[in-house]
Amino acid sequence: MKIRQFCEFDRSDLIKLWHAVFPDDPSHNEPSKVIEAKLAIDNLIFIAEHEGLIIGACMAGYDGHRGWLYAVAVCNEQRRSGVGSALVQHAIQALKVMGCIKVNLQIRATNTEVTTFYKSLGFVIEERLSMGTFIG
């Protein structure tokens, strides 16, 4: 497995992976728009590749103060094989090089499987309330 930065030729395969892993994502998370918006800011999209196929991806961000993991996706056939962990560690290292000292993420409170995954990587549940509003 190789982890590398997203390249334009990855776009269609990344969108397919996203749809497969996040079939119930709301319409405001439509992957082609999210990818375009993310690339306009930075190139913190990482691809896990095996034998020329995209098997996972991680989208991260850095606002100059905190780092964020926005999405980690691994194809069903490769889950629990270390791909997700490797992607997260790669993203964290890239953020660290940029000067980031803390990485945040948000997951649904009911998603216990993903909570366990992130805890295994050193993340802890913080006493925070996440709020949001749609403006567009």
Task: Label every model-predicted segment.
Residues 5-71, 75, 94, 125-128, ...:
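Acetyl-CoA-dependent GNAT
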Residues 13, 86-87, 113:
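Charged catalytic carboxylate motif
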Residues 80-93, 120:
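Conserved acetyl-CoA-binding loop-helix of GNAT-fold acetyltransferases
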Residues 95-107:
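Conserved GNAT acetyl-CoA-binding A-motif
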Residues 105-114, 132-136:
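Conserved beta-strand-loop-alpha-helix junction that forms the acyl-donor binding cleft
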Residues 113-127:
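Short acidic, glycine/proline-enriched helix-loop-strand junctions
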